[in-house]
């Protein structure tokens, strides 16, 4: 992890040939935004404003669907916080809204939750899992208040975060936890059907303006739809 698929075979072969002398964390060593130098231009065009995590959490608690863009992208097929769409999984029809009006994909496709590592046991049966940071396992959901991330068999493909592994996600959860009894958020990759996970601000804003996503947050700047 976080890149357990055929596309990472060459990297695995390299590590097998020459074992690293220390642990190498490649989670967020993917592509930078190719138009990062134009961020201020987009801020001016959209009238974007900078928010703190409390304000972002309030939008999510209010039922808004928010795209998040921070730093370089993730390595591998999992969106682990730097290229993510997040929303409140306590809302019963959120899965259907995302599939039909944002991701444009089949109705049955599931979504993943993320929560703080130290709180995961409250909502998920994590007893038999050593590492849940990479959305690689599906523990059983222990509560019935998370319909939008619970699979038909009662499991969910969980990602846990710490302040060290993803400070933005962790702070967002801290603030969301002050607003909700169930401190879990829904996370899905920031792309729409037929497109890869985004690699530019232009891609992020295209998705915003061509789906029913409500907002995009880029490095804590809030972008709304162009009027």
Name each model feature, range by range.
Residues 1-227:
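Flexible beta->alpha loop and helix N-cap segments adjacent to enzyme active/binding sites
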């Amino acid at each position: 992890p976080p890149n357990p698929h055929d596309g990472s075979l060459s990297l695995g072969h390299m590590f097998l040939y020459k074992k690293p002398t220390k642990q190498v964390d490649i989670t967020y060593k993917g592509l930078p935004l190719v138009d990062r130098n134009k961020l201020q231009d987009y801020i001016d065009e959209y009238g974007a404003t900078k928010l703190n995590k409390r304000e972002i959490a309030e939008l999510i608690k209010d039922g808004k669907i928010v795209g998040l863009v921070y730093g370089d992208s993730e390595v591998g097929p999992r969106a682990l916080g730097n290229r993510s769409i997040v929303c409140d999984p306590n809302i019963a029809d959120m899965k259907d809204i995302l599939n039909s009006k944002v991701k444009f994909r089949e109705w049955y496709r599931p979504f993943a939750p993320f929560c703080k590592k130290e709180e995961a046991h409250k909502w998920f049966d994590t007893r038999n899992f050593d590492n849940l940071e990479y959305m690689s396992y599906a523990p059983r959901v222990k509560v019935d208040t998370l319909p939008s991330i619970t699979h038909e068999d009662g499991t969910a493909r969980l990602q846990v975060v710490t302040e060290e592994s993803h400070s933005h996600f962790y702070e967002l959860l801290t603030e969301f936890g002050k607003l909700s009894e169930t401190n879990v958020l829904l996370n899905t990759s920031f792309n729409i059907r037929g497109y890869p996970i985004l690699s530019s601000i232009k891609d992020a804003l295209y998705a915003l303006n061509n789906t029913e996503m409500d907002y995009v947050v880029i490095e804590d700047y809030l972008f709304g739809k162009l009027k």
